[in-house]
Amino acid sequence: MFYVADRTEMQEIDRLTIEEKGVPGILLMERAAITVLEEINSRLKSINADRKLKCLVVVEGGNNGGDGLALARLLYQQGDIVHVCYINGISRVSDSFSYQLEIAKKIGIQVTDHIIDSDYDVVVDGIFGVGPKRDVA
């Protein structure tokens, strides 16, 4: 059995890592994306490594969306089919999100405000993170 940190503890871990250890938030974003990519590959590409996955990444303009965009880029760069659905549900867009969005667009990832298909191998939540602060409708 292992311990899983709750929302408050995860936020404190992130804060300590960034402020006290000096690790930039954008680097944490990349590490999170790499870890999720490895998990996706181990589960879905273990039998057929050449299989192209069809992936939907749903993002909002905060840091969770930045995490999703970083993952979208890694999936795209390994040859998977990636669609990003950007739901503009918050008024403030984080700098890290803007940075990741700019990269995604420059390399050719399709970013729209709607879901263009209903048949995906992978659907990624780049909205809620470690726990929503508001009601989910």
Predicted features by range, described:
Residues 2-5, 45-137:
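Glycine-rich phosphate/dinucleotide-binding loop and adjoining beta-alpha-beta core of small-molecule
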Residues 1-52:
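Positively charged, low-complexity intrinsically disordered leader regions
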